[in-house]
């Protein structure tokens, strides 16, 4: 069984309490999404990390107890629900001492559509981050070409400024962007297929 391929295979393998590899894979896949999700709801970095840890621990316990039914909803929605209750518990425990940035957490936490959007945005960010890391580590793409793409697409640096800083032509900037985008698109598609039944 290839636990790196799909959420389905990973979930099946999680029933084996002795399979630490699959748990590590699951953790690597979902912890960053959960941390980003909590941060986007106004939690501090430390509280976001704590919420992610509590959510993952609760997930594993409930999953192994047979409480997750794929017919009733997607894994992402279930993780959002667990995280939501962990955040509400944090608010209750803090009894007014905890101040969230931005909108009221209660309003945000009651808006399922907003929560789903925050989750999906974080999921997309995680996929792109993983794809960029893979492109940098495993491809023969020139690091300068990748830097062009990052400057343009991640940091929104104007093409002329990228060309000036890297001492290349604007035409070369656009060529580099196109090459990296094409390679990155293929990696993203493969990674998305690993999350195939979790959207």
What are these model-derived regions, one by one?
Residues 2-11, 27-28, 35, 45-65, ...:
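Conserved RNAP core-binding helix
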Residues 2-10, 97-120:
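Internal acidic/polar
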Residues 15-16, 40-43, 54-72, 93-95:
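Sigma70-family region 2
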Residues 16-36:
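A short, charge-rich alpha-helical start-of-domain segment used by transcription regulators
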Residues 26-27, 134-161:
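Short amphipathic alpha helix immediately N-terminal
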Residues 63-81, 170, 175:
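Short, aromatic/basic-enriched loop-to-helix "N-cap" motif that marks the start
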Residues 65, 80-101:
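Arg/Lys-rich amphipathic alpha helix in sigma70-family domain 2
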Residues 158-190:
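DNA-recognition helix of helix-turn-helix
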């Amino acid at each position: 069984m290839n636990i790196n391929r799909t959420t389905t295979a990973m979930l099946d393998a999680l029933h084996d309490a002795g399979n630490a590899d699959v748990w590590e894979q699951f953790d690597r896949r979902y912890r960053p999404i959960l941390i980003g999700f909590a941060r986007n709801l106004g939690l501090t970095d430390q509280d976001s990390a704590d919420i992610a840890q509590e959510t993952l621990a609760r997930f594993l316990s409930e999953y192994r107890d047979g409480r997750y039914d794929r017919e009733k909803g997607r894994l992402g929605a279930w993780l959002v629900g667990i995280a939501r209750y962990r955040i509400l518990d944090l608010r209750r425990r803090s009894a007014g001492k905890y101040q969230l940035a931005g909108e009221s957490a209660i309003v945000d936490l009651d808006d399922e559509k907003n929560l789903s959007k925050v989750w999906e945005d974080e999921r997309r960010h995680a996929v792109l981050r993983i794809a960029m890391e893979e492109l940098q580590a495993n491809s023969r793409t020139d690091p300068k070409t990748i830097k062009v793409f990052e400057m343009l697409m991640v940091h929104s640096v104007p093409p002329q400024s990228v060309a000036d800083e890297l001492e290349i032509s604007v035409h070369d900037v656009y060529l580099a962007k196109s090459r990296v985008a094409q390679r990155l698109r293929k990696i993203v598609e493969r990674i998305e297929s690993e999350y195939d039944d979790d959207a």
